[in-house]
Amino acid sequence: MERCDVVVIGAGPAGLATAGALRHYGIGATVLERDAIGASWRKHYDRLHLHTVRWLSHLPGYKMPRRYGDWVSRDDVVEYLEDYVDAHNIDVRQGVEVEGLERDGDGWRVRTSEGDFSAPRVVIATGYNKHQHLPDWPGLDTYTGDLTHSGNYKNADPYVGKNVLVVGTGNSGAEICVDLIESGAKHVQMSVRTPPTVLLRDNNGMPGQAFGVLFRHMPVGMMDRAWPLIQKTAVGDLSEYGLPLPPPGAYSKFLRDDVTPILDVGLVEMLKERKVEVVAAVERFEGADVVLADGSRIQPDAVIAGTGFTRGLEPLVGDLDLIEPVKGRPIVHGAETHPNAPGLYFIGYTNPVSGMFREIRIVAKRIAKSIARDRVPTE
């Protein structure tokens, strides 16, 4: 069994940020990754850019290069993560799958495909979007069209000349709608159950994220009342295009359920030009038909389900009573640990309006400070 000062599970932005922040205190972390560095980013769709601005999206101790531009591409994010590992000399063990985690005296034993690791501190950073979530729609097994999850979408090439239904109103679903139209899909519909909040990614040179940072310091009650006005000021009232203003209380729902606003990269224009049609929520499938909540039926050639992801933490820590039963999120996060699991940290499982990369940077520093304060070096 290999003894380590700290074991970090996951070599995505959150795991690497924590390992990099620990370097500031002279602590080396062993990062275990079942795939490759930044694996989830490598799998994203081709046109993806960060919806948060470069200068607010770096990890601890290493800025993103200016040559990446304001909105960093998928490939540049992957390059940045690889360079981050080199810059901080982080020990990343790729191809190592974690199979279990258990208490071992005052520390933890991490069981993996390559043997066991022991450490007094373990940081879990397996990712916000680990497993694709597909609703259990009635009749789904009868659908004769093509259906895929947005996590499998790479580009619009397979959909040129086709009628496509995109289900869901997250940032991925919104950008996929734009990509489909710009690349030659015949007709694009967007299925909406709960109208999203839509904000601008860029406000005449001011990134929308900067407002998100400000919003986090405002009273929640005030933000609940202001949220509809904020959208109306940013993009106008989209009700006539099928997206009514968010109701009062939408900001609280965002905080409670991690329902992120759409940071617009072209959807608003597509809606106003009637190039993307908003339709009701999907209720069920019947052969070639998709039956919607308003009773209407449509027959798209393909359905892309932008229906989100789950954290997938249950196999790893489900027996420790650390996971919210419905949402699957850890009940503690950041530098806070649970009495049932001292020395076990979670990072990267929130998606704040101020930006995930920025949040990761802040939380990683807090975790590193906590570990350094309580550190008992391994022999």
What are the language-model segments listed below?
Residues 2-11, 16-42, 69-171, 175-205, ...:
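Flavin (primarily FAD) cofactor-binding/catalytic cores of flavoenzymes
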Residues 36-61:
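Redox-cofactor-proximal catalytic regions of oxidoreductases
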Residues 56-63, 244-249:
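Short, basic/glycine-rich phosphate-binding loops at helix/coil junctions
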Residues 63-69:
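A short acidic, helix-capping loop that chelates divalent metal ions and anchors anionic groups
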